[in-house]
């Protein structure tokens, strides 16, 4: 009967297991770093895309801000002779020339419409966290200015416009002013100086608010241009 000698495998030293563990750890760690870097790059790219999109929104906004501003400037110009017209009307209720200009200049106003597609994405999709702190601050400041202006527009100025329109209905002859162009006939349907005075008081407030909104629009446009220059210099968008 043959007896086979058992083959003894040399026992591995602890250093062998240490190096195996270290290599495995490094492989996992490097994989984690690679994944982290990839996610970081993806988020950085997404953040830049938001900036580019917001930049395009600002280009639209500046164009529309200019149009609205010019509309208000035209109003203020057309309504600049309020005091002289008031004196003329009290002296002659048939005075038509100055009233025609005041009537046209106080009809309606340009609503400020801004492009908020990127802003909504930044807010609703958590996009603000992808922006650098200074970039996010610029976006938030501009958004606050826009929302503040639109709040004034839909409250204070709209109320002033509504009041003026209501008084105009009591004062002007529909048959003469219905097409926006004054035709022959008596322009006023009342000689009540109280109503005439109310109209000019409301008109005076309207002019003051128009001048105030010109300043606000100029500030908004200046802020938009500054942000565009800042982003363009930082990210070379154009």
Placement of each model-derived feature along the sequence:
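Long, hydrophobic alpha-helical segments that serve as membrane-spanning/inserting helices
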Residues: 1-15, 36-238
């Amino acid at each position: 009967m043959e007896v086979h000698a058992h083959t003894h495998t040399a026992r591995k030293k602890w250093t062998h297991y240490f190096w195996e563990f270290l290599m495995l750890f490094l492989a996992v760690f490097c994989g984690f770093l690679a994944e982290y870097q990839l996610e970081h790059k993806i988020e950085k790219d997404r953040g830049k895309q938001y900036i580019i999109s917001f930049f395009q929104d600002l280009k639209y906004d500046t164009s529309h801000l200019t149009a609205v501003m010019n509309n208000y400037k035209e109003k203020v110009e057309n309504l600049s002779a309020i005091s002289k017209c008031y004196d003329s009307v009290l002296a002659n209720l048939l005075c038509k020339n100055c009233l025609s200009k005041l009537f046209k200049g106080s009809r309606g106003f340009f609503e400020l419409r801004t492009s908020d597609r990127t802003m909504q994405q930044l807010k609703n999709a958590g996009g603000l966290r992808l922006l650098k702190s200074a970039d996010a601050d610029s976006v938030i400041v501009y958004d606050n200015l826009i929302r503040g202006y639109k709040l004034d527009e839909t409250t204070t100025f709209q109320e002033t416009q509504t009041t003026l329109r209501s008084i105009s209905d009591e004062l002007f002859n529909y048959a003469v002013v219905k097409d926006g162009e004054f035709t022959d006939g008596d322009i006023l349907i009342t000689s009540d100086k109280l109503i005439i005075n109310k109209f000019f008081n409301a008109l005076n407030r309207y002019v003051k608010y128009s001048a105030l909104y010109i300043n606000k629009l100029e500030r908004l446009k200046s802020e938009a241009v500054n942000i565009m220059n800042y982003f363009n210099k930082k990210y070379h968008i154009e």
